[in-house]
Amino acid sequence: MAETPKNSETSKGTRSWWSKNWFYTVLIAIALIDGLSAFGLPLIVSQPYSAGDSISTLRQAILAATGGVLAILTLWESRRKNIQEKEKNDQDHTPQVHAERRARYAKALEQLADAKAPVRLGGVYTLIKLVDEWLADEKTLPNEEERREEGQVIINSLCAYIRSPFDLASKTEELSEHKAPENYEGGNQQFIKDQARFREEKELRLTILEAVRNRLNKGTRVHKNGTQKLLPGQWSGFDYDFSNTVFFYPVGFNNSYFGASSNFSGAEFTENTNFSKAKFVEKADFSRAKFAKKADISRVKFTDADFSGAEFTEKADFCWAKFAEDVDFSRVKFTKNANFYEAKFTKDAKFYRAEFTEKAGFTRAKFTDADFTGAKFAEDANFSWAKFAEKADFCWAEFAEKADFTWIKFADYAQFGWAKFTEDANFSAVKFTKDVEFSAAKFAKNASFSGAKFTKNAKFSWAKFTKGADFSWAEFIRNTDFFEATFEEKPIFEYELYSEIFKAKFSHRANPEDYNFKVSHNSPYKIETKEQEHNGIKFVIPKDAELFDPDEPSE
């Protein structure tokens, strides 16, 4: 039966009385029981248990035991009250602690706005200390997420200061000199004043970045196989917003563990930048960022990264970088060498309309889905030994100097339609596992496909070869289409080296109609063909080529 309100109130009242008086009730009960036992039990026991025992001895033993129990209970209750009192004092003290920290935070913000650099620096140190205090305060703020939120507020203030404009940032190069340049605005005296203020502000901002970096890793853990794992630091769980910041000083976040979002979009790095061996667990946004000096982003582990519209004026080093999710380099401008040696792109890698003014190195890089549509390579482009697990799109790409695609494996569709190769293009020993298209591509110099393997359809329709086109030792297994192609020189399907002849091979397992060698009627050179029969089936293939069985590699 449900308890009536009256009974409920009675029950609550009983529990309330019991919770307040249980100790004294138990204490009195024990004293009464043991007292009665001490005086009553000897009357019940007729004789001592053994020689030498007496009634008084038994009574004393019972009273002694009772006293011990009461003493223990009293001590326990005293300790319990002390703990409760301490907890109450802590609870009463918590608001005071939090209020005191927030007051220090407000004061530190005032200091950051002060005209004097030492005062601003004092505010910075206070803010750094406050973040550490919040994170370590499990006593007054047990919830970890709440501690992080309190720290994030202060981190936001530090980032806001880094983002704030500095009027002398535009004179970084001049103020970094030992003496005033000629015609310096305000003369030598003004230069001395500006330089002192410039150095003070530079030191202050570097102090903030150093404090952040020192707390973004807790060292590394070395595994049995020798690999190292970067450990997150106490500040790794914060979001960092450095968007549109002008970094007029070197930036070093090497070996830093960014466990939350990192925003460097629109930032300007006027000095050397070092992110080597850093790790970005969440999105790293470098879109529209400008790197005026060397950018070391080697061995960095990215999850989701955006470099779209970024500009690299000096060398950009992405060697051994790893991108776990999509990465966007569309419309990026690399003025100097860009090196992606052994970089690993686990998902989509977008280099749409990217511009490489000097050498572009992608040797041994591993791509999944790669988009280089409309990309421009002003100097050598090296993709040798790279691997493309899915689609590789170089449609409309322009290669002004040598293009090296030797020993590459394309596991999926490869698109080079309308691409322009101004200098030599080398596709020797390439494996095209799926369809490949060079439709309307233009080769101004030598184009080598020697030793290449075309497993599926190979399309060269409307392609234009101005110089030599070498297909010797290449293997064509399926459809091969040279419809309306143009050859300014005689195409090569046979090559002799040390008295050994290497011929292009065409599969006799393909449909004879899938071989099309009808080049443009305006082509100065045609593909000379011959008719060859296999098992009663006639094939038309280049004169210097031969039929083969792709299932018998030794043939």
Where are these regions (language model features)?
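Periodic self-assembly scaffolds
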Residues: P48-K107, E138, P142, E146
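N-terminal leader/targeting and pre-domain segments
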Residues: D92-T94, A103-E110, A115-L121, Y125-I128, ...
